[in-house]
Amino acid sequence: AMEGKVWLIKMTVDELVVYQNNHIISNVIPVGNRMEVRVVSDDKPAADAISTPPTLEDAYLYEFNSDWRTA
């Protein structure tokens, strides 16, 4: 089940560049001078991360990356 595995985090572009190296990013939406980033993660990835309902794309990315990590 994907509930509790998708998070919204607001961050700068510079933070996103570093963040995407270690996390599964499913979507990025510009909001002013920051980015609203959807992160797929088993654990809360940041103190200010907000849990959000998963989409089909989130589930696909989670499963694809899970298979890749265990290959």
Regions found by a protein language model. Name each.
Residues 1-39:
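ABC transporter nucleotide-binding domain
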Residues 31-71:
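C-terminal coupling/interaction segments
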